[in-house]
A protein has these predicted regions:
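N-terminal active-site segment of His-dependent metallophosphoesterases
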Residues: 1-65
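Extended active-site neighborhood of metal-dependent phosphoesterases/phosphodiesterases
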Residues: 61-152
């Protein structure tokens, strides 16, 4: 039997800013709202939406508040991932219900039956200069990955 197909859409590097600040003369919030409207209109059969980092441009709570507002009306499952511009603590304040692993990392797995998606948190602690923060996988995160892979048949 052929594997069942799933429609998964990934939005990456949305770089939300505070108060309509622009990046390269573009407003990331307007662009995200347009993308969400497009998804709602053209991809009603969406099974899962994934946002890979950078969710925010400066890791500010206000930037995650925009993300929360824009995504709050979506009925599809959503997975968020951190990037080097993100701040886990600021994200947590706006999304306190979001799943964190036992070590406080924002990583998860989704089992679609025929395949599994693994989402790793590579944000380097502590949050610092974003230009120098290229990501990191510590032993705890690698152990989590190894455990997830061991669960796969």
């Amino acid at each position: 039997m052929a594997p069942s197909l799933k429609k998964i859409i990934i939005l990456s590097d949305i770089h939300l800013t505070s108060d309509g600040k622009k990046i390269a003369d573009l407003d990331p919030l307007n662009k995200l709202e347009a993308a969400i409207n497009h998804l709602l209109e053209k991809h009603k059969d969406l099974d899962h939406l994934v946002f890979t980092g950078d969710l925010a441009n400066n890791g500010l709570e206000s930037e995650y508040a925009h993300l929360k507002k824009v995504t709050s009306g979506l009925s599809n499952p959503i997975t968020f991932m951190m990037g080097n511009h993100d701040n886990r603590d600021s994200f947590r304040k706006e999304f306190p219900y979001y799943a964190f692993d036992e070590n406080g990392f924002i990583q998860s797995s989704i089992n679609f039956g025929d395949y599994i998606l693994l989402f790793l948190d590579s944000l380097k602690d502590p949050y610092s200069n974003v230009e120098k923060n290229k990501g990191f996988l510590c032993k705890k995160r690698l152990d989590w990955l190894e455990n997830q892979l061991s669960l796969v048949e």
